Amino acid sequence: MARPAGHAASQAGGTAAADARQMRLVAAVIAVTMALWLGVQWLGGQQDWPAKYAFLADLAAIGALIWSLLVTFRIWRRRKASSQGQG
């Protein structure tokens, strides 16, 4: 079945919109991660929590930041491929 002429353009626009949504999600995850990480570090210092809880907060923050980096890398690769006419 033949595709409508505007199908490729609408698909590219949909990909750009999806990329924009994902980048907003990445930005929110980074901002919330940093705020929570700083808050937990401060609260742990005030309440004299054991160091294991600080390390747990560090690992959770590292996990969120690695996820953000991977999603950003995927978006970058997808945009690079589409700008070179491969996607």
Curated annotation (Swiss-Prot):
Give the principal location in a single coarse category: membrane
* Positions of disulphide bridges: none
Question: Which N-terminal residues, if any, form the signal peptide?
Answer: none
What membrane topology is annotated for this entry? Multi-pass membrane protein
GO CC, any one term: plasma membrane
Task: Determine if Transmembrane helix is one of this entry's keywords.
Answer: yes
Q: Where in the cell is it found?
A: Cell membrane
Supply the Pfam families for this chain: DUF5337
Give a yes or no for keyword Cell membrane in this entry.
yes
- Looking at the UniProt entry, the stretches that span the membrane are 25-45, 53-73
Q: Which UniProt keywords apply?
A: Cell membrane, Membrane, Transmembrane, Transmembrane helix
Q: What name does the UniProt record give this protein?
A: Uncharacterized 9.3 kDa protein in nqo2 3'region
Task: Say which species the protein is native to.
Answer: Paracoccus denitrificans
